[in-house]
């Protein structure tokens, strides 16, 4: 078993997507991990991100939490993001001594000492590691989901509001995996309603 420092980094991904759950990861890194390539997941190409995620998982104690589209629609994306973070932390097999959280807000009812960091995924290694694991895990999930819904190109856009995704929504409507309360989707649905009047 490797030595660890008991500091956990937590980050979520998928807040800005129009489809799919929001994912979060909590990561406690090994002291021996090579941190050179661990940085904000958004700045790492897809294939390298998958390899880094695998490396981080092998050299850490980690857990992943999610919040569903239904929960996002019901409690809003901020609260759903915090819920996914809480779920990731609750699933950790080791209780950290402190949690470093990306962003301004922390999940409710955390019974662990924590600090929040704006742009923490760019500054704090354990948060960057959590960002990589969360994004790689969500990307793979969306690729698999995209096989069932190929018209929306989720294998390329991962649920984000790209031109091809928005065109897919306009042409084919929405699925149960779409966040119907999000403004771009709401606007498309409203324009379709007006067209039928």
Q: What is the predicted role of each segment?
A:
Residues 1-197:
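RNase H-like, Mg2+-dependent phosphodiesterase core
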């Amino acid at each position: 078993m490797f030595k660890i420092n008991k500091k956990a980094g937590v980050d979520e991904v998928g807040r800005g997507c129009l489809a799919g759950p929001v994912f979060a990861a909590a990561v406690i890194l090994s002291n021996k991990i090579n941190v050179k390539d661990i940085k904000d997941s958004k700045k790492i190409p897809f294939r390298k991100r998958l390899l880094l995620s695998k490396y981080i998982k092998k050299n850490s104690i980690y857990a992943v939490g999610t919040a569903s589209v239904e929960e996002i629609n019901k409690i809003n994306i901020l609260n759903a993001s915090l819920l996914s973070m809480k779920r990731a932390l609750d699933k950790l097999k080791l209780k950290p001594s402190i949690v470093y959280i990306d962003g301004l807000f922390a999940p409710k009812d955390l019974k662990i000492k924590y600090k929040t960091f704006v742009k923490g995924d760019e500054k704090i290694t354990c948060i960057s590691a959590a960002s990589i694991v969360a994004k790689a895990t969500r990307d793979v999930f969306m690729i698999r989901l995209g096989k069932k819904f190929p018209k929306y190109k989720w294998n390329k856009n991962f649920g984000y509001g790209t031109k091809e995704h928005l065109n897919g929504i306009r042409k084919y409507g929405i699925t149960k995996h779409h966040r119907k309360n999000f403004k771009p989707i709401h606007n498309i649905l409203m324009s379709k309603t007006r067209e039928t009047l």
